[in-house]
């Protein structure tokens, strides 16, 4: 973190992961309740068993967040993170007869993107391939043509009480949140 412990609120600080604060006799003390280096090590015979455990743990983490009876939405790029989450969430929701709304940014064609061999400004074709694998995904492609980070700034500040990390994506974030809210998504 660039500024460990700091939050956007005056005199409100963030604790380190796996810590809590104890107040005793007028003194604050920070106590670590979990130490990853002290966890029991797992020893398997086969490499495949480690892979299975990672997938099983990841699957449980994703599925535990999918509350029944609500519309679920996810941001979907062609990256590993969002694609992995969507690839687990979609079949799980399909078993419950539910759909998954996904949101993908479509870049402004007028913008001059850097020519970098690893930079993909328009990820929509790869996203469409992912979406094609899951019949219960309803994909939404958000075009912020002619907008920039300042377009929705005033409305954003009025509606959200916290700063965001990637202000360059503010217009897209604002539109996704409003569209998802209108659809009843969480």
Where are these regions (language model features)?
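N-terminal segments that mediate ammonia production and transfer
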Residues: 1-45
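ATP-dependent adenylate-handling active sites, centered on carboxylate activation for C-N bond formation
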Residues: 37-186
């Amino acid at each position: 973190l660039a500024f460990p412990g700091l939050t956007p609120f005056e005199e409100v600080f963030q604790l380190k992961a796996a810590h809590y604060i104890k107040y005793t006799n007028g003194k604050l003390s920070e106590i670590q309740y979990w130490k990853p280096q002290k966890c029991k090590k797992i020893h398997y015979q086969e490499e495949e068993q480690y892979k299975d455990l990672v997938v099983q743990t990841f699957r449980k983490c994703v599925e535990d967040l999918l509350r029944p009876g609500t519309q679920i939405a996810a941001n979907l790029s062609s990256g590993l993170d969002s694609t992995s989450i969507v690839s687990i969430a979609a079949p799980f929701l399909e078993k419950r007869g539910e759909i998954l709304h996904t949101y993908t940014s479509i870049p402004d064609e007028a913008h001059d993107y850097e020519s970098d061999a690893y930079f993909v400004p328009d990820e929509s074709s790869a996203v469409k391939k992912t979406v094609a694998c899951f019949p219960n995904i309803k994909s939404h492609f958000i075009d912020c043509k002619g907008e920039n980070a300042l377009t929705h700034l005033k409305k954003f500040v009025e509606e959200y009480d916290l700063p965001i990390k990637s202000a360059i994506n503010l217009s897209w974030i604002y539109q996704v949140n409003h569209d998802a809210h209108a659809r009843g998504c969480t």
